[in-house]
């Protein structure tokens, strides 16, 4: 497992084997990161979120608290996963997804402050 510069981790986080984290990644309380996950620069994972094995999180993406990502799911750069969402398919860059199963709510986001919901 490798950690980039400025990596931040809170209490009770679990990190599986062979993961890679970019620069200034934030893992909030009780997040669980499965084996072989890749989290790119400036991504943020909310409290209690679960990334199953081999997930990919793009640069600047935000994963809301309590969200669950199925094995092998990719979340594109600057995408946002709503709190409690269950993501079973890849999320394109710049999209906001929510629900169970997660569905696209908004497209064309440039970052977290651009949500407007």
Predicted region positions:
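Structural signal for interior beta-strand "rungs" in well-ordered beta-sheet cores
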Residues: 1-98, 102-105
């Amino acid at each position: 497992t490798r950690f980039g510069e400025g990596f931040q981790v809170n209490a009770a986080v679990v990190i599986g084997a062979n993961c890679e984290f970019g620069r200034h990644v934030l893992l909030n309380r009780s997040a669980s990161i499965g084996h072989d996950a890749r989290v790119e620069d400036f991504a943020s994972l909310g409290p209690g979120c679960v990334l199953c094995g081999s997930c990919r999180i793009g640069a600047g993406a935000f994963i809301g608290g309590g969200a669950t990502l199925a094995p092998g799911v990719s979340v594109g750069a600057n995408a946002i996963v709503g709190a409690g969402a269950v993501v079973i398919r890849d999320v394109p860059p710049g999209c906001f997804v929510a629900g169970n199963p997660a569905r696209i709510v908004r497209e064309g986001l440039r970052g977290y402050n651009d949500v407007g919901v």
